[in-house]
Amino acid sequence: NVISGKDKALQKRIIEEGKDSKADLYITADAGRLGAFQAKGMFQRGASSKAIKAAVPSNFRTAYWTGIAKRARIIYYSPERVSASELKGMTYESLADPKWKGKVVIRKSNNVYNQSLVASLIKNNGKKATAEWAKGVVANMARDSKGNDRAQILAVAAGEADLAVANTYYLALMLSGKKGPEQQAAAKKVKPFFPNQDGRGTHMN
């Protein structure tokens, strides 16, 4: 049997059912969510079989959970207002550069996708540098944070911003036409850019 639902609702159900829970597998998006749920003691060790170790790189699994898919959190840009040469060597850290003042959009900081990105920045750059980076990004924002990842892409397409941070699959979803012709047309007005290619690489989750 498969029970689908919102992440928080499913976690609440598993916690309330406790030892009586019939759930064998819990599938959700983002390692941050998995880590938080693991910290509550809700997983059993067992995600370390030979088959899993052979199929999944060590950085995408623990003894308690394993990744089964991955996506990148990248930068989208307007090719009409930003040239490819301007993005050469672009990093997540570059989003705090004053040259992008009034040109960046990203969803709210309470979003788990952003929290995981920030966690990776803390891991690589330290808490102090990451805190300064966050202040720089806020100073560069074209508007107050609002909406989901697709809303950020739409903002770039509409000319409200030049750069947006969003996961890769949202662009594919928009281009497919499943979200309507307006979003499909908007998606064609932006281009994806994978940052940090000269260093640690793009953030994957």
Where are the model-predicted features located?
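Short beta-strand->loop
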Residues: F43-K50, R61-I68, Y77-P79, A84-S85, E93, P98-N125, P181-G201, ...
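Alpha-to-beta junction loops
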Residues: E17-Y26, M42, W100-G102, A158-A166
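Beta->alpha turn/N-cap motifs
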Residues: K6-D7, I27-G32, S49-K50, N148-D149, ...
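Early extracytoplasmic/lumenal segment of secretory-pathway proteins
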Residues: N1-G35
